[in-house]
Amino acid sequence: YLEDFGDIFLPENKNSKESIFAVQTSDYEDDHTTYGRANWSIMLNGCWGMWSCGWDFHKPSQNLVNAFKTENGLPMFEHYNDKIDYPVNGQVSTQKWDPRLFHTVGMPTFPYKYESEYMQTVANSRTPNTYGYYTSLKEVPQRSKGETFNGSWQAFATADYVFRYTDVMLMRAEALVELNRLDEAQDIINDIRQRAANSISKHIDYAADMC
């Protein structure tokens, strides 16, 4: 699999060794068509005010953000949702987070999809009083890469994954659990978790102290 979790969701890696089965898309500049064969299912997920037609759909919930809390390097299975928490860029906190949060959820005060020239603010939420200030990151490219649809509406050529390599690894781990081969299953799960723990320096070094 790819060494950094964040690389999975960048368009340039959409057919990497991480991808087992994915719905294919293309940019109009790559396939020489008028409009490309974009992923229309995610066309409205661009961050409000960040893209030419970002409608801020597919909003991450506070419950999802809370689920990324960690304690001593492990998920907080029982008390993660006891109170509302969220990281703030540059603010010291005793609460630690799974690095995958910063690859998954766009949050005010942080770079949008790793790019410091595009900082996300509270103004980048279309309906904050209803749905909050978070935005989804996995479905969109970096802002500097631009949109991939040559028309009045935005669309992206990001991959629509059905199975990733790590999904297959987890299926194997689950089968090993059923066979009572728990040590082997644990090794696979820990391998995946270690990849997540290491996915800091390349893209989200600004969040290193929070993980």
Where are the model-predicted features located?
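Acidic/polar-rich alpha-helix caps and helix-coil junctions
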Residues: Y1-N39, L74-C211
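Short, cationic low-complexity segments
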Residues: R37-A67, A123-G132
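Active-site-adjacent helix-turn-beta-strand microarchitecture at beta-sheet edges
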Residues: T70
